Swiss-Prot record:
Protein name in the entry: Threonine--tRNA ligase
UniProt region (Catalytic), positions on chain: 244-535
A matching Pfam family: tRNA-synt_2b
Assigned keywords, A-Z: Aminoacyl-tRNA synthetase, ATP-binding, Cytoplasm, Ligase, Metal-binding, Nucleotide-binding, Protein biosynthesis, RNA-binding, tRNA-binding, Zinc
Subcellular compartments: Cytoplasm
Name of the coding gene: thrS
Function of the protein: Catalyzes the attachment of threonine to tRNA(Thr) in a two-step reaction: L-threonine is first activated by ATP to form Thr-AMP and then transferred to the acceptor end of tRNA(Thr). Also edits incorrectly charged L-seryl-tRNA(Thr).
Length: 642
């Protein structure tokens, strides 16, 4: 009979197979009431599943913000299915998984759902959840599951069974009163746990993500353990909507996208100014950290991509073209090109480390449904670098990369950075000795800099361990940007060698390094982080000179010209409009400084300075203001005096 070991080491003996809920009941009614599911020997199970042998058990409760919340959200997806089938009996249910901060359900319904319909569906979900009905799990044979869904006309569930479930498996069917769904689970024991949810929006999604399949309707929702957490999340979503880079990009005339070039960015003058400033900043860092900048071809013969191994792994994501009976691929990444540059001319150990960087224009054929403004595109620019070094140089080079990452991120104001180290997978290339040495070098580099990190066992690429840097923005959203990836494979495949101290030919270790990742995506992140209020050094327009009447027009024009000659992005607004109108317009455009020229300022050779947040900085002599703004730009100061 089972002996159950709890997390505190205590044991409970039972005469018969016992469920997680029954164990909780044996401890106390309060725990039983809060029990959502269990974790038996590390595997999640439903609260009703019987434990037949000795096992360790963790009880998942409403206090669990990871597994407990994920289970509640998954059960809310089933609740959504229950409500949908009551309101739209002809709807065919596809899949309803959890995602970050929520869940969705894909449905096949002839009627296009509106926001009004969404409110009706949510109201029905509330009615159902209030009854706190029991969720009943039944393990059935494959055939019984298929017969169940065939009788209900659920063709998508039948397809999942046919293609993804073994015939000898026993699928779990979850009964929500008259509604039945299929899932691996676990799920909540009753709907009393699903009281704090919100349906968010509707989008289109191809079945199985394949554009050759039917377009389904995807309903997104979110759920939390309590009302306070739900409301806080909804408030963050409202703020995120205000900061949406697509909306602000249009408002500030930064860029646009159009149907004739899906996933490709049309940079306008203002947006391109931001892009170029980022390039200048990264180039400054490249010089500081000893990189040489190179430029590889946009397109290379298929033969090279086959030799590198990318053709086998990335062919579907590569754009191709043919000419003179040769097939070419537009590069999805820069690394094979950088090895071609390294291979030109004999290299000695004295030439290493060799740090090669490129603002590489890359293209990947991302699914149309995944494209999102400039955050997820098909054409993008990588601030990519590859370091060729010896095994003994790994740690010093990794340390330098990490310093560069932190130097860069702190310049933009990102302080909350989560670091993950991925170690060797089961299937890999390279000796255990080089893996030992490399993993230890990464660990030592992080420890030497007092950087906390999480080890992801077995999550490294087959060709080397990796460090990932994830930024958390002002809305606590995670953005994985920087990587430091060791590679023992590609230099071998593409014939990269150097002459060692003993005159032997050796293969260099290659370190892939990205700081921003994609410049397009990083600009999108910055737009939303700053809500369009770029720091002065990045702002497309750094100052605007406005006159009060036509009398000061020439003076305002002269002021703007002098600012421009001093390298400041400035212009004069000499329109015959009221001063209040002009100030409001440029405030909405997030111009850092507005320089007002009236009669007094013109006579004294001064300007009246105010910030975009409405702060009056008083009057400045023009040269004094130029010195002030130049110092702010040169220091890449984050915040204005506002």
């Amino acid at each position: 009979m089972p002996i159950i070991t709890l997390p505190d080491g205590s044991q409970r003996h039972f005469d018969n197979p016992v469920s997680t809920l029954e164990v909780a009941q044996s401890i106390g009614p309060g725990l039983a009431k809060a029990t959502i599911a269990g974790r038996v020997n590390g595997a999640r199970v439903d609260a009703c599943d019987l434990i037949e042998h000795d096992a360790s058990l963790e009880i998942i409760t409403t206090k669990d913000e990871v597994d407990g919340l994920e289970i509640v959200r998954h059960s809310c997806a089933h609740l959504l299915g229950h409500a949908l089938k009551q309101l739209y009996p002809n709807a065919k249910m596809a899949i309803g998984p959890t995602i970050d901060s929520g869940f969705y359900y894909d449905i096949d319904l002839e009627q296009s759902l509106s926001q009004e319909d969404l409110e009706k569906i949510e109201a029905r979900m509330v009615e159902l959840a209030k009854t706190k009905y029991a969720v009943v799990k039944k393990k059935v044979s494959w055939q019984e599951a298929r017969d169940t869904f065939e009788s209900r006309g659920e063709s998508y569930k039948m397809e999942i069974l046919d293609e993804n479930v073994a015939r000898d498996d026993r699928p779990g069917l979850y009964h929500h009163e008259e509604y039945i769904d299929m899932c691996r689970g676990p799920h909540v024991p009753h709907m009393g746990f699903c009281q704090n949810f919100k349906l968010l929006n509707i989008a289109g999604a191809y079945w199985r993500g394949n554009s050759d399949n039917k377009m389904l309707q995807r309903i997104y929702g979110t759920a939390f353990h309590d009302k306070k957490a739900l409301q806080a999340h909804l408030t963050r979503l409202e703020e995120a909507a205000k900061r949406d880079h697509r909306k602000i990009g249009k408002q500030l005339d930064l860029f646009h996208m159009q149907q004739e070039a899906p996933g490709m960015v049309f940079w306008h003058h203002n947006g391109w100014s931001v892009f170029r400033e980022l390039e200048i900043f990264i180039r400054h860092k490249l010089n500081e950290y000893g990189y040489q900048e190179v430029k590889g071809p946009l397109m290379m013969d298929r033969v090279l991509w086959e030799r590198s191994g990318h053709w086998d792994k990335y062919a579907d994501a590569m754009f191709t073209t043919s000419s003179e009976n040769r097939e070419y691929a537009i590069k999805p990444m820069n690394c094979p090109g950088h090895i071609q540059i390294f291979n030109q001319g004999l290299k000695s150990y004295r030439d290493l480390p060799l740090r090669m960087a490129e603002f590489g224009s890359c293209h990947r054929n991302e699914p149309s449904g995944s494209l999102h403004g400039i955050m997820r595109v098909r054409g993008f620019t990588q601030d990519d670098a590859h370091i060729f070094c010896t095994e003994d140089q790994i740690q010093q080079e990794v340390t330098s990369c990490i310093k560069m990452v932190y130097d860069t991120y702190t310049t933009f104001g990102f302080q909350n950075i989560v670091v993950k180290l991925s170690t060797r997978p089961e299937k890999r290339v390279g000796s255990d000795e080089i893996w030992d040495k490399s993993e230890q070098a990464l660990i030592d580099s992080l420890k030497a800099m007092d950087i906390p990190f999480e080890i992801q066992e077995g999550e490294g690429a087959f060709y080397g361990p990796k460090i990932e840097f994830t930024l958390y923005d002002c809305l606590d959203r995670a953005w994985q940007c920087g990587t430091v990836q060791l590679d023992f494979n590609l230099p071998t495949r593409l014939g990269a060698t150097y002459v060692g101290e003993s005159n032997e030919r050796l293969i260099p270790v290659m370190i892939h390094r990205a700081i921003l990742g994609s410049l397009e995506r990083f600009i999108g992140i910055l737009i939303e982080e700053y809500a369009g209020f770029f720091p002065t050094w990045l702002a497309p327009e750094q100052a605007v000179v406005v006159n009060i009447t036509d009398k000061q027009a020439d003076y305002a024009h002269e002021v703007a010209q002098k600012l421009q000659k001093c390298g400041i992005r400035a212009k004069a607004d000499l329109r015959n409009e009221k001063i209040g109108f002009k100030i409001r317009e440029h405030t909405l455009k997030r111009v850092p400084y507005m320089l007002v020229c009236g009669d007094q300022e013109m006579e004294a050779g001064e300007i009246a300075v105010r910030t975009r947040k409405g702060k009056d900085l008083g009057k400045f002599k023009l040269d004094d203001f130029i010195a002030h703004i130049q110092a702010e730009i040169a220091s890449r100061k984050l915040n204005l005096e506002e």
